[in-house]
């Protein structure tokens, strides 16, 4: 049996059963390359909608579980330290999620991505449901909720590295920012779906808020196992009417045929080591940038419904259900922000410029939302939407296009076996910030919400500053066409450079 440090694949890829079934009814016997791309795009898109939807019930039921409700809350969260305990639950989930991300990324480059992803989805569905089961089982042990969240975080961590790796196997760098900008809408749509499902079911008891997303996750996990093609060689896909063994171009150098490199050798390139992945140009600054970006975005993810329900808007307090529904406006802004950030970064050939610019604009957006959001519902909606655009936009850009770019960086010489590892490093580091933000908010909000927003604005500022070196390199490239400098310092080769045509 291969050891943990083994750099070879530990599995044999097979064509999914669902695709074999579809091919029996197709006249040509095979799906086209574009049909496979569409299938991968849709399946990975809805899969991560489900992942995000499964995270949302925690924020929706916070007000119900805490002592501020008429019913008196739910022990052990109904005491004066209830918000702090809820923050600790969030910390447990996100801490394990962050650590698990690094491990999942390491394994994702070595295991069958389809099976590994399915395990993550079904496991997530199971433990999301178990949190809600406490409602009917009348569980009140803090350690029960803690243990369930720890396991949920562990299985959730499997999703992202696997999904980005699969998507990267099917789409090259050309227009990747725009494509992944659209695809990254899954984050916001998942939050919206989770909010609407959890809020809609809350009236029947808070346990139902967890069961709805749990069933969705489990069902889609089965669909993914049956239909998701991990990479072109697995399904013998042909690209744009050409044979799969057409040569692949790395810069100006023609290397071995695609068939030889991916089929004859069993797709058997060595996986990039964890420390080696950190040394890929651009990985470290974007990883630490995402630390602060996710600190801001996940604070909103976990606390925005609670904040809305506990602060007067237009002279009145909103119900828990209404607050949960209203909070989806932040994610609607995130959909626009993700697409906009991807498009701008493609046009400028500058991922760092775009990400930092959005985070700098998030600072006044946060300030205005805190100061003027209470005046009326209309103003609150406008400012919440604006905040979502500038906060989720760079979050989506870094976790998708940037991660895929760096996972196929030219320094890897065409080896796409770093995709899951690089994605895990970047999103895993960001998830540490995501764990810290909500738990700090649980304590700081008990003192002052103003202090919470000052913390978020400071994090947004630091996030932008961390990309300063990359921004300088990208600006020089824009002004003087210094591609070599960007290649050495920035996140990815500029879009004007010939794309690495290796079906990554």
Curated annotation (Swiss-Prot):
Cellular component terms (Gene Ontology): membrane
One GO BP annotation of this record: phosphate ion homeostasis
Membrane topology classification: Multi-pass membrane protein
The keyword Iron-sulfur belongs to this UniProt entry's keyword annotation: no
Keyword set, alphabetical order: Membrane, Sugar transport, Transmembrane, Transmembrane helix, Transport
Compartment(s): Membrane
Alphabetical list of Pfam families matching this protein: MFS_1 (PF07690)
A GO MF term: transmembrane transporter activity
Reported tissue expression: Expressed in the root-hair differentiation zone.
TM regions (residue ranges): 31-51, 84-104, 116-136, 145-165, 178-198, 210-230, 280-302, 324-344, 352-372, 378-398, 424-444, 452-472
Keyword Ribonucleoprotein attributed: no
Alphabetical list of PANTHER family matching this protein: GLYCEROL-3-PHOSPHATE TRANSPORTER 2-RELATED, MAJOR FACILITATOR SUPERFAMILY TRANSPORTER 16, ISOFORM B
Family per similarity comment: Belongs to the major facilitator superfamily. Organophosphate:Pi antiporter (OPA) (TC 2.A.1.4) family.
Designated name of the protein: Putative glycerol-3-phosphate transporter 2
Organism: Arabidopsis thaliana
């Amino acid at each position: 049996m291969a050891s943990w440090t083994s750099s070879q694949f530990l599995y044999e890829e097979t064509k999914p059963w669902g695709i074999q079934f579809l091919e029996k009814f197709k006249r040509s016997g095979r799906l086209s390359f574009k049909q496979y791309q569409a299938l991968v795009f849709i399946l990975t898109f809805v899969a991560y909608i489900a992942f995000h939807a499964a995270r949302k019930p925690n924020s929706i039921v916070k007000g119900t579980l805490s002592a501020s409700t008429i019913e008196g809350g739910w022990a052990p969260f109904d005491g004066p330290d209830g918000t702090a305990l809820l923050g600790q639950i969030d910390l447990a989930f996100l801490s394990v999620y962050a650590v698990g991300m690094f491990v999942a990324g390491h394994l994702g480059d070595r295991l069958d991505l389809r099976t590994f992803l399915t395990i993550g989805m079904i496991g997530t569905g199971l433990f999301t449901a178990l949190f809600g089961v406490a409602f009917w089982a009348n569980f009140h042990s803090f350690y029960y909720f803690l243990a369930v969240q720890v396991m949920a975080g562990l299985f959730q961590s499997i999703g992202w590295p696997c999904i980005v790796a699969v998507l990267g196997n099917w789409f090259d760098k050309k227009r990747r920012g725009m494509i992944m900008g659209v695809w990254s809408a899954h984050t916001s749509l998942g939050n919206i779906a989770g909010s609407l499902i959890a809020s809609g079911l809350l009236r029947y008891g808070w346990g139902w808020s967890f069961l709805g997303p749990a069933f969705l996750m489990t069902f889609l996990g089965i669909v993914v196992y049956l239909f998701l093609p991990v990479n072109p060689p697995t399904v013998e896909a042909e690209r744009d009417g050409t044979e799969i063994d057409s040569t692949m171009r790395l810069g100006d150098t023609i290397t071995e045929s695609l068939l030889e490199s991916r089929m004859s050798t069993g797709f058997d390139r060595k996986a990039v080591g964890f420390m080696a992945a950190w040394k890929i140009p651009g990985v470290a600054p974007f990883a630490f940038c995402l630390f602060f970006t996710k600190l801001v975005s996940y604070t909103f993810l976990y606390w925005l419904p609670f904040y809305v329900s506990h602060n007067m808007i237009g002279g009145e307090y909103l119900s828990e259900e209404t607050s949960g529904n209203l909070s989806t406006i932040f994610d609607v802004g995130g959909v626009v922000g993700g697409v906009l950030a991807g498009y701008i970064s493609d046009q400028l050939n500058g991922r760092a410029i775009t990400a930092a610019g959005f985070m700098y604009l998030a600072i006044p957006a946060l300030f205005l939302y805190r100061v003027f959001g209470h005046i009326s519902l209309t103003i609150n909606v406008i400012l919440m939407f604006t905040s979502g655009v500038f906060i989720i936009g760079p979050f989506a850009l870094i976790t998708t296009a940037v991660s895929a770019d760096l996972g196929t960086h030219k320094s890897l010489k065409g080896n796409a076996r770093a995709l899951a590892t690089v994605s895990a490093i970047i999103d895993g580091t960001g998830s540490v910030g995501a764990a810290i933000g909500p738990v700090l908010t649980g304590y700081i909000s008990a003192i002052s919400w103003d202090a919470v927003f000052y913390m978020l604005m400071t994090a947004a500022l630091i996030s932008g500053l961390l990309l300063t070196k990359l921004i300088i390199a990208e600006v020089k490239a824009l002004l003087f066409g210094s591609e070599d400098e960007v290649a050495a310092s920035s996140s990815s080769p500029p879009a004007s450079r010939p794309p690495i045509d290796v079906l990554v």
